[in-house]
Amino acid sequence: FAPQSWDFLLNALIKKGFTKEEIEHAGIAIKKQEGPGVYDRFRSRIMFPIADSSGRIIGFGGRIFSVPSGAASQVVPTDKTEAKYINTPQTMIYDKSSVLYAFDVAKQDIRAQNKVVLVEGYMDCVMSHQAGVTYTVAVSGTALTPRQLQMLRRLCDMIISSFDTDAAGESATRRSLALASEFDFERRVAHIHTGKDPADAVLEN
């Protein structure tokens, strides 16, 4: 959880001995457009740590949320114009084209099942794991890449696309399956009729 503050994490990390430049280069602070200094990138968001294949945290995703009336005064409802999700930008250790969310915890089951379920978002992935589909990973805000498919091809033969059922999700499904064909995957699509995305389907069932 990232509170609605411009400098909560910044001040905490400075107290730990990090410089403002180091915090900015890590992608968790943004340089001010006017004047010196930086401010927290993630504010009033549910946070999702992004790990590499060994489980080391290399970035974050943050989902905006609205705060119910009566919540603590230091947290305020978010601006509807803000992006629903924001992610750590490209850094020295975080390259979104070569990372799959939850790959570190799913890879053993992907190998054991010889298949992977591919979803779009963090919540889709979390809810799938909670429902027992532990061979699920998420692309998390980026188009599926050859590097990501190479990672998966080492572990399994089948890829099951379960993207959102809106127009953007259907387009992403077509692109992902076309790209997966170049890596000789057996390809499947999981059609979801009960909700807009996999997280909705898990909640309703």
Residue locations for each model-derived region?
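Phosphate-handling DNA/RNA-contact segment within nucleic-acid enzymes
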Residues: 5-155, 159, 172-173
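Conserved phosphate-handling catalytic cores of large alpha/beta enzymes
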Residues: 144-205
